[in-house]
């Protein structure tokens, strides 16, 4: 039985031709079939979710089936990841993503781009992950400041049939801004597009590959409109010589890159429907959403130095939709035929899953309503989850008010029982709660700067015990705990070491005399607060329009 139906087919022809002369190892007038499979933004999802969706066991079955199909047609497969293996699922986070990397080995990944979340841990952890991985972790634009040398392999070379394929890795230069500054004291992220130009030239002069692909973790922004984010794949493709890459396998923005029109993605892509990838400057750009929800499949034909895409599809990995029947009952129904889980993978990952679950499933409290932590809320508006987290930090530190990046809130908690797993999904980064004692004047300056952080970015701030009206770069009617700020008074503010050391572009506090690092991990602080405050009444934490922008 064939696992796949063809997706977007022959209408998607494009041509990739190397600008330089290559040492021809391929046969003239022979057509070579190359299939590039890709995922990105895995974020710890080695195991299926509670609805039986995605997971590496089903992914392996899918990939194995494609490999068999392609081999039967005389073709070859390359499997790439756009990065961010780390951070998002507690069972993975507590084990430094060891199950994820070992599972990726079994699936048969060939290479991955290093993502910004690979730096959520110290570099020593990433070096251990490199040892677990039987495939290269690539980034051409990450350098050690003190030596000026690259920290990782910039590219990897693969032989498929008679073809030499080069894969370049590139990482968003936002990493130093959105990651933990304490981990970047000797690390520099150079402009990816500039490094890509250099690496392509070097490859063409030295290795002379037949095909060059970029595996990136930079983000896809329609028409290159990246806002406060660093430039992404579209901008890079436009900056490179036309057709200098066959394709960009992307990540970071966590989108299904399926175009509705030129320079405009589909807003609500439906799993299992046709997907046309983006094309900029003769370069295909693909991205497979997140978490292993899809495996992207790009089928190419290479003939006489020309690379043509003949088919593209996003293949759902057991994704389901919620259906409500006439009797009011609902269930989750597969979009596409079920993919069986590979039992060898289940055997490999079960011990990791069981070890993690044992630590995480114990009830720590309960809530009478939903605590809102979804990405499309915490980066745009104040939420009750933000208030709860900051209440916990104020409680631990005795602070008058608290601030943090909305991007540090990673999940919601539904009404009902709360486990430590729920808490760790909300705050997976292991940041430390800190506080700073500041004069009222310093508070005014700090909050004025933070209030300029724009919505639709991880930097958008969540506030507690703060009220103001922001207009024209100034704060009007600024109050702490309902009282006007006294410039001569001393106030204590709680936040995370991430923000206090300049993360997300926030003003630095760690060099101030009144700065204290408590040593308490954020998730542990939230857990303890929930335990002592349970059952939680969500109305207590509901924002009431205290902060506004005009």
Curated annotation (Swiss-Prot):
Any single Pfam family the record assigns to this protein: Metallophos
Site (Transition state stabilizer): 117, 120
Cofactor(s), names only, from the UniProt record: Zn(2+)
Superkingdom of origin: Bacteria
Activity regulation (UniProt): The activity of this protein is inhibited by an intracellular protein inhibitor.
InterPro entries: 5'-Nucleotdase_C, 5'-Nucleotdase_C_sf, 5'-Nucleotdase_CS, 5_nucleotidase/apyrase, Calcineurin-like_PHP_ApaH, Metallo-depent_PP-like
Compartments (UniProt record): Periplasm
Key words of the record: Disulfide bond, Hydrolase, Metal-binding, Nucleotide-binding, Periplasm, Signal, Zinc
Enzyme kind, highest EC tier: hydrolase
E.C. number(s) listed in UniProt: 3.6.1.45, 3.1.3.5
Catalytic activity: UDP-sugar + H2O = UMP + alpha-D-aldose 1-phosphate; a ribonucleoside 5'-phosphate + H2O = a ribonucleoside + phosphate
Record bears the keyword Heme: no
Protein residues bound to Zn(2+) 1: 41, 43, 84, 254
Record's cofactor remark: Binds 2 Zn(2+) ions per subunit.
Disulfide bonds: 258-275
Any GO CC annotation of this UniProt entry: outer membrane-bounded periplasmic space
Gene Ontology MF: a single term: nucleotide binding
Signal peptide bounds: 1-25
Residues noted as binding Zn(2+) 2 in the record, renumbered to the chain: 84, 116, 217, 252
Residue sites binding substrate per the record: 375-379, 498-504
Membrane-spanning ranges: none
A GO biological process held by the record: nucleotide catabolic process
Known function: Degradation of external UDP-glucose to uridine monophosphate and glucose-1-phosphate, which can then be used by the cell.
Oligomeric form and interacting partners: Monomer.
Protein family (similarity comment): Belongs to the 5'-nucleotidase family.
Name listed for the protein in its UniProt record: Protein UshA
Natural source organism: Escherichia coli (strain K12)
Lineage: Bacteria, Pseudomonadati, Pseudomonadota, Gammaproteobacteria, Enterobacterales
């Amino acid at each position: 039985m064939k696992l796949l139906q063809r997706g977007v087919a022959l209408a998607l022809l494009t041509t990739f031709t190397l600008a330089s002369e290559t040492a021809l190892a391929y046969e003239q007038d022979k057509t070579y079939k190359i299939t590039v499979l890709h995922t990105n933004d895995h974020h710890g999802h080695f195991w299926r979710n509670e609805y039986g969706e995605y997971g590496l066991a089903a992914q392996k079955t899918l990939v194995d089936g494609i490999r068999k199909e392609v081999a039967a047609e005389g073709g070859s497969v390359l499997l790439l990841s756009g990065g961010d293996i780390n951070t998002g699922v507690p069972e993975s986070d507590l084990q430094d993503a060891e199950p994820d990397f070992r599972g990726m080995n079994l699936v048969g990944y060939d290479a991955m781009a290093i993502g910004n979340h690979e730096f959520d841990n110290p570099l020593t952890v990433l070096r251990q992950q490199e040892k677990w991985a039987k495939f290269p972790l690539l980034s051409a634009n990450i350098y050690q400041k003190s030596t000026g040398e690259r920290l990782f392999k910039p590219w990897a070379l693969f032989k498929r049939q008679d073809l030499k394929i080069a894969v370049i890795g590139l990482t968003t230069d936002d990493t130093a801004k959105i990651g933990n500054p304490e981990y970047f004291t000797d690390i520099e992220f150079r402009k990816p597009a500039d490094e890509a130009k250099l690496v392509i030239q070097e490859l063409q002069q030295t290795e002379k590959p037949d095909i060059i692909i970029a595996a990136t973790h930079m983000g896809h922004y329609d028409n290159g409109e990246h806002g406060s984010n660093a430039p992404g794949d579209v901008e890079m493709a436009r900056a490179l010589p036309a057709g200098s890459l066959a394709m960009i396998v992307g990540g970071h923005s966590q989108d299904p890159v399926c175009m509705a029109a030129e320079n405009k993605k589909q807003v609500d892509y439906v799993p299992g429907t046709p997907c046309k990838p983006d094309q900029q400057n003769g370069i295909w750009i693909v991205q497979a959403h997140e978490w292993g929800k899809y495996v992207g499949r790009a089928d190419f034909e290479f003939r006489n130095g020309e690379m043509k895409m003949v088919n593209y599809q996003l293949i759902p990995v057991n994704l389901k939709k919620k259906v409500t029947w006439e009797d009011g009952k609902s269930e989750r129904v597969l979009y596409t035929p079920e993919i069986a889980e590979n039992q060898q993978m289940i055997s490999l990952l079960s011990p990791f899953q069981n070890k993690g679950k044992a630590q995480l499933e114990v009830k720590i409290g309960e809530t009478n309503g939903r605590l809102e932590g979804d990405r499309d809320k915490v980066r745009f508006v104040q939420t009750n989850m933000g208030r709860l987290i900051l209440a916990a930090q104020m409680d631990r530190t005795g602070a008058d008010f608290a601030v943090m990046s909305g991007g540090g809130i990673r999940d919601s908690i539904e009404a009902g029982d709360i486990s430590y797993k729920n808490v760790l999904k909300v705050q997976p980064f292991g940041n430390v709660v800190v506080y700073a004692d500041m004069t009222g004047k310093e508070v005014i300056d700090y909050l004025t700067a933070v209030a300029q952080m724009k919505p639709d970015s991880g930097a958008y701030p969540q506030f507690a015990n703060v009220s103001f009206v922001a207009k024209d770069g100034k704060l009007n009617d600024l109050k702490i705990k309902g009282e006007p700020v006294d410039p001569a008074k001393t106030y204590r503010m709680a936040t995370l070491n991430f923000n206090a050391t300049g993360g997300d572009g926030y003003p630095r506090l760690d060099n101030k005399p009144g700065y204290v690092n408590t040593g308490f991990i954020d998730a542990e602080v939230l857990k303890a607060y929930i335990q002592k405050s349970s059952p939680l009444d969500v109305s207590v934490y509901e924002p009431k329009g205290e902060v506004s922008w005009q």
